[in-house]
């Protein structure tokens, strides 16, 4: 009997659901409440009225519970048990309800007979039970005519006055926290106003909407970027953008995200590969590791799961691995390091073991390593040509289909090979006043303005795709879709061109929402696997049913397809209210706002550099991550000396001596050095190429870390990155006495080359409370504590929870602040930082030029600017007498007379007169140019450029003009030649001076000269000009006439003063 009452309480007697009496605030959830209400189903008003009358007739005051008979202890629930509820004695029929499954298995035959009464009880005023209003999964609604009963556990205790639910009406869960708790009796119900027929609905509705308005207000602002949010949980999720944390990890592939919605969206890629727990067979329902855990716990879970480890990207390096989209990724050959397993490390960096190049994702590293191996796994089935990248294969396939896909314009008849170019061409007709052509449907006559819209419409007329019955639980195999009908914008196929190459090349047009395997030989174009196209039986990834009718690209969501189609149509619906610039995506518009506001809320904690976008800050942080000792040790293969704890030992973690106490050895010659900085400087002696150059002095380096340290020389002399910190209790073998595993043991287990794992171990994010891959604890106590601040600064004593936070903080003590502000006394390390700080004391630009109106911060800047309006040239050359505005211009000019080229390139021995010219020249050597011409020895970066160059030696003119048949070597030459065949442009004549122009740009500049003022005047004749360029040309005329200018002596060369 008690079990039945408990089941009744679970069905309708809980007091903490939506219709409960307590006034706890509405719980925070990451979605908009009003958006949720807009997507609910509505029930007929008549049915709700009948049910409301039935519920209102029930008594409002619960009676005392009866004494339960002795029964065995209740079973353990997987969900929170609910409080029992029993009405008054005058309604005996309402005391019985549906029994739970647990009571039917343990009670006597009398209780089993009561379990057969499954219908909900009704008050005695009803002669017959009313018809069922709702399904079992969706009980009667509690808030008007909106059915919210299926989502009561999401809304906590936000209540609205209404009829008290009866025993047969569900009212939510009894324990909002989701943990099992004790049963709640009616005497424990919190006090509140009486509800029922005597309640005032108007007064309670006011309170309800007042609470709803409280929830809709944005009361939680961000302290970094001042963005505000409605709920505190949204603010917590937003702060991950500034901190860079990615706590949600995928249990299958190991990718991490900073929002749970991004992880859920990513999980759709693995929906055909369900996670297999350690039991063997897949379990029904979503498991906790499959939904993603924070990195501190998910990594340990994934590492203990054999199935999860086997699904990582580097589980089977000897065999080709299958990616999430179903395509086969070639395995790395022997000698090439595979990226670290996604279940053991963070999100990077991943270093190449051959060239030490660092990548953020393991897929990028694997794609890069194909360059070293020379492997070309992607081959064309038409001409058997191989490529090392999938994108190169996609571009190559289009060359085979170029003869078939010729799309004519319906207005002028011009033919295009790409539908996107056709749409842009038709937009030019629309801008000129010519209406764009429409595309009618052959079946119903409906017209559309874009061809892809017609293709989606024709999918509705197509018959449904027949499927074969599944065998042994396997997925059903779709039948081949109907052939693609000839569209109104496609030319009919020529029967003479239907050979094997043309048939294979024309294989990829997607018809509506049904993927047609046009390119069956190249399923990579449609994102499928095997030869079955995007939806074939071999596809291991999710089906992409929404395909673009122009380029054939497939998408999994209709919204993504609509956004993609804007690329072809050129539609830009989002416009900037300040400058009027339009964008395709709202995200691009939000990024564009930084141009007008000049806000840079994202600041690097290491160097203080500010950025306007979080992506720029994330890319910038990768530069500093290479300064970590473990990152350097893992990326360059440094060997530690004997008797030390290694690069990742306690010394690096700030628990023992500083870097000077460690001995680092060069892996090439074995020479020992006190710290990593000297090792990196020494290893450059073994390198032949030094691609990183300093823009200030021209010195080159082999590592970008050395270049970063060198740039501090131009500002201040840097101290060491890692200072000694107080050491904690250590064991005799150098490890932590608390029993934790230090990072050196992790490196000894084969992870020394995996930079991402070493960095994650230093940051303390992969070991949970024990931190199996982290560093030892600083301070008192031998054990580790996940909540304590473990790393302390030896200079100021500030402590941090993670080692990365300590390294970030030590930059404050790294540089010497020698330049002080004369107004506030604040010191800075560089002159540029001091200049930026001085501007904060100036409220406005108070120095204005009386000639042109330009404003300046300081009087010295104004005086230098006023030289443009006068004849003053204080810096003159002693050889030719030419005058200059600035001394820097004079130093550059003197090279013309001396002929000195003091800057020499160390690679090709070429000399330059200026250091900036040498720095620009060195960029050519930094980029590899492996393609060499056998005839003249000229090198190129890409093979396509080499093939285009070799046409000069062969005399082949591959590009010909369509009008006159003249041949050219380059495409740019034929495009420039075809302008002569175009009709002459209309002559643009100025209405003020009747001067004619052919170029609209020059015409607009000329009109601006009439409309604006002429602040630049000649001192000889008083004529004014709109810019300095016109004034300079005018001065040359005076020189030729012999009028003379001050200090020139009649020399024509002196007229070239800048």
Curated annotation (Swiss-Prot):
Composition-biased stretches (Gly residues): 8-21
Keyword terms, alphabetized: DNA-binding, Isopeptide bond, Metal-binding, Nucleus, Repeat, Transcription, Transcription regulation, Ubl conjugation, Zinc, Zinc-finger
PROSITE patterns (UniProt xref): ZINC_FINGER_C2H2_1, ZINC_FINGER_C2H2_2
Positions with biased composition (Pro residues): 61-78, 120-133
Keyword Transcription: yes
Spans annotated as Disordered: 1-24, 58-134, 156-201, 269-342, 459-486, 721-743
GO cellular component, one term: nucleus
Glycyl lysine isopeptide (Lys-Gly) (interchain with G-Cter in SUMO2), cross-linked positions: 801, 1039
Compartments reported by the entry: Nucleus
Keyword Cytoplasm: no
Cited Pfam families: zf-C2H2, zf-C2H2_6
Segments forming C2H2-type zinc fingers: 220-242, 248-270, 350-372, 378-400, 407-429, 439-461, 546-568, 574-596, 602-624, 664-686, 692-714, 791-813, 819-841, 847-869, 875-897, 903-925, 931-953, 959-981, 988-1010, 1016-1038
GO molecular function per UniProt: DNA binding; zinc ion binding
Tree of life domain: Eukaryota
Biased composition (Low complexity): 93-113, 172-187, 294-324
Family named by the database record: Belongs to the krueppel C2H2-type zinc-finger protein family.
Function: May be involved in transcriptional regulation.
Descriptive protein name: Zinc finger protein 865
